[in-house]
Amino acid sequence: MNQINKFIKNLYLIIITIILIIVISNDNNGLFINGQSLPDGFCPQPLIYRNSTNRKADIDNGYNFVGETNCLLPCPSPLFPKSQWESYFEMSLIMGSISMFASLFLIITYSPLINKKHTRHTVGILCMSIGIFFVMVSDGRQLWDIESPGEYKKYCPDTGRYARQSDTKCLTTGLFFQFGCVTAIGWWSILAVDLWMTIAKKVQTTKKQLLYYLIGINTVSLILTFGPVVKNQYGFGNAAIGCWMLDLKYQYGFFWIPVGICLSVGSVFIGLIFWEIYKISDAVKKRYLKKHIKPLCLIVLMCLEFLYMFIYYSYITANQPTYNKHVAEYIMCLIINAANVPGSYTCQLKTVSPTAQFLFLIAIRLMGLQGLIFYGLTAATKKVWANSWIYKDLLKLFKLFTTKLYNDSSSEEVENSNYSNNNSNYYSSNGYTTGGSDNGVGSGRSDKFTKSSSNGGAQDNNNNNNNNNNNNNNNNNNNNNNNNNSSSLEISGVESNNSTPRVNSPDNLQP
């Protein structure tokens, strides 16, 4: 009976497959199948079945249905293997974190907090760094929101559901990313114009004109950022590692066309910069190149990165029908092999090159690090920090610390010296001298104690008494006793009538 049921099931799948092939062969425009459905509750892996009661609401919430079926594409999409997706997110975590801290350093360096002297050049660096910082804090994975490998709860909140604007984290990261990108490339083009004006020695920008730049670029950035919100355009897409605009027309209107304009302006002025350098003499040329080589390198590198992103995206968009066809073939392969044992067949999705996609994703995530190298590690940056109040206060604290440390060390040395002098004065004032042992080897203890009663000895004792006031009375008594005798007496276990007895026997030592 089981074999009969299995045969009927396989026959049913074969019939459905034949029908699907006929339908697809007559429909070249659809992503999958129009007006066709699979058996209820059945979806070949890795597709996910969903019993939808409100299909439109589910689509708006981020469920990506395959054609007219109840099958969902997994999240993240099968455009890339899971291992490739993981490498993309790990790259965003590492490079995004590095660029985030690098851009944060530039923001602090060129902010009014540290840099008191502002020019259009420093303001341009500051604003571009702010834009890059916004991009990095909204990247695929962040240091403060790291998920376990293989988990993408921020972008795939539920099984088979792609995050949408209604998800707070998705909307926040999407807004930050869009605002940061538009701001960064807008100020990049301003920096290209500024470098040309500096080298060509054109009219200097006034503070009023600089204020117009700030208001104009920020206003345009805010419009381009919040405009798509009206149409619920922010969400997690099939080939992204973060939330961004979903529909192609909004991507072009609110991002790629403005990017193309800024890219064109920047490229024109880069050409003018090289022309100005070409016209001047060799001696002056060397001086200008030495002075402006770092800003020029950064502007050219960012131009190449933005240009690659623009060309790559245009290529993907132009070949979208081809990729849709590949997706249809992939799903067809899954359906044909649905009756087979999982793992006994392989369905590969022919999509964009993983390497090209990796370069596309990493291009913008290098900009913070590049900004640090070409704008942060310069003599101008060193001068800004050297003149900052933070550096001066830290220098004062360091000097106070080292001075206190030196004074404490000197006080300790003085105390040790006084202690040694007091001990020496004590023994000298009592007329004791230490001698070596009989065998000539010093033992640290005296084998003989000698007391002098000569006038010279009295003078030495009197000199020592001047250094030790606490022993004056004892010294005077000793001196008087010494003066009453005309010769030295060596005490060897015998008391003298005119002197205090001293004993050299260990058994009879007195304190």
UniProtKB/Swiss-Prot annotation:
> Which sequence ranges form a coiled-coil region, renumbered to this chain?
none
Q: Pull the Cytoplasmic topological domain ranges from the record.
A: 115-122, 194-209, 275-295, 379-511
Tell me the residue ranges located in the Extracellular compartment per UniProt.
Answer: 26-93, 144-172, 231-253, 317-357
Compositional bias (Polar residues) at which positions?
451-460, 486-511
Question: Which UniProt keywords are listed?
Answer: Glycoprotein, Membrane, Receptor, Signal, Transmembrane, Transmembrane helix
What SUPFAM superfamilies has UniProt attached to this entry? Family A G protein-coupled receptor-like (SSF81321)
Tell me if Phosphoprotein is a UniProt keyword of this record.
no
- Record's superkingdom? Eukaryota
Residues annotated as signal peptide: 1-25
Please report which protein family the annotation says this sequence is part of: Belongs to the G-protein coupled receptor Fz/Smo family.
Official protein name in the record? Frizzled/smoothened-like sans CRD protein C
Q: What is the scientific name of the source organism?
A: Dictyostelium discoideum
